[in-house]
Amino acid sequence: MNIVVCVKQTADTAATVTVEDGKISWGDTPMILNPWDEYAVEEALRIKEKHGGKVTVLSLGPESAKEALKPALAMGCDEGILVSDPAFASADSLVVSKIIAAAIQKIEDVDMVCFGRASVDSDTGMTGSQVGRRLGWPTLNLVAEITALDPQGKSISVERMLEEGRQQVRASLPAVVSVVKEINEPRYPSFMGIRKASKAEIPVWSKDDIGLEEVPQSAVEWPQVFAPPKIEMVVEMIEGDTPEQKAVKLADRLLEEKVI
């Protein structure tokens, strides 16, 4: 099977976000592979190990986004591709989906595209569905398990994790699959894998390389971003010899503050 895993470079989850000159700033925070995408990479590798084939990891972003591809290569992906162009700088998720779909079509003969559930920075979870729509392929979201896969018969069966329970779904291949963390436990890259990934040559595709003559403008613009105002809080400890005494004092204070 020929599988493409779409990943994103995000800031470390321990980062402190600040607002500078009306824009979000990550400061000197290290950038990492989006944690949700590790599960998509792992699942693609497991499919390859069982059915054979090739796993290509694809990312969209500046030149620095190559660093998000290297952990996936270290885990075992065969090839990494970065799609980067100054024209993509202000792309929203809808424009991003058009760019990614064009890159996937350039790769050709793709059987499956895998996404993580969402990115930890924007957390919209829309890009996978939008890419599936542009490709005209079935899209399976919130996948917690791939229960059956038939590369020859071009079919896939999955179990989706919904708020009210689980749902069994079957679709034809090629398909777009978005996974949740319950699907697997991502492997740790080996030392040799890390060394190999550090030396890997990652091609960069521009808008011309993927056949986009024009890049649509984002429908939404963020002219300025505001930091929420700081809230000063005063904590009052309710004391008492017994839980009952504390409860009475707490109720009295809430009545005084007209909370109840």
How should each PLM-predicted stretch be described?
Residues 1-260:
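N-terminal glycine-rich FAD/FM-binding segment characteristic of electron-transfer flavoproteins
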